[in-house]
Structure formats: structure tokens, C-alpha cells
A protein has these predicted regions:
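Membrane-interface helix-loop junctions in multi-pass transporters/channels
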Residues: 1-127
């Protein structure tokens, strides 16, 4: 059990740091009008989760500990629904209702599409 906890924790550590760096790369959403950092990590994280899940479904290439590190730890630390929710609150409070609606719609649609694409790519390559 300890090795699983360490795998999840260290994956979360790495994912959170990468998320922070991506947030820093993009401008402040209050100046651009769009929370690019959160949007980017959620779409990329969904794509990666789809790829990893597809590989796990078709092969035994990813041991359980590595799967926990990548899917639960890294993807969990990298993507962030709470930041997505907070971005929406800020857009709403700023009166940016159309941007708020577009951000919610685009994140959900592209996030789900990205996980399907990632899964398709992984399972197609591994046939």
C-alpha cells in the first residue's frame, strides 16, 4: 500500500508543478479574458488520460504502480476541476456571461473529445 501512496503522491507532485508552470506561461485570465492555463491543462490532461487508459486496456505495458502514478497522481495533479470552477465564478462575477458559457462549453466538449481521441489513438496503435 505504501508504494501505491508514494506513486500517487509523487505523480501529483509532478503534475501540480507542471500545471503551475503552464499557468505561469499564459497571461492572467483577467487580462486576456480567457483562462488559457486551466483550459490547456484540462484538455491536455484529458488527452493523456485517454491515451494511458487505452494503453492499459489493450496491453500490460503499464504496471499498476505506474498507472497510479500517471493516471491518479499526475493527471489528478495536472488537471484541476476546482480551478475550472473558480475561473467560471470569476468570469461570472466580471459579468462576462458569454465568455463564461463558451468556456464551460468548450472545456467540457473538447475535454471529452480529447479523451476519446487519446483512447482511439492508443488503441489504434496497439492493435
Amino acid at each position: 500500500m505504501t508504494k501505491f501512496l508514494l506513486a500517487v503522491g509523487s505523480g501529483g507532485f509532478v503534475g501540480s508543478i507542471l500545471r503551475f508552470l503552464i499557468f505561469k506561461y499564459f497571461e492572467n485570465p483577467q487580462t486576456t479574458g480567457w483562462p488559457w492555463g486551466t483550459f490547456t491543462v484540462n484538455i491536455l490532461g484529458s488527452l493523456l488520460a485517454g491515451i494511458l487508459f487505452g494503453i492499459s486496456e489493450k496491453t500490460n505495458l503499464i504496471p499498476e504502480t505506474l498507472s497510479l502514478f500517471l493516471l491518479v497522481g499526475f493527471c489528478g495533479g495536472f488537471t484541476t476541476f476546482s480551478a475550472f470552477a473558480l475561473d467560471n465564478l470569476k468570469l461570472f462575477q466580471a459579468g462576462a456571461f458569454m465568455q463564461n458559457f463558451l468556456y464551460i462549453s468548450a472545456t467540457i466538449l473538447l475535454g471529452v473529445l480529447a479523451i476519446f481521441i487519446g483512447h482511439f489513438l492508443a488503441t489504434s496503435v496497439l492493435k
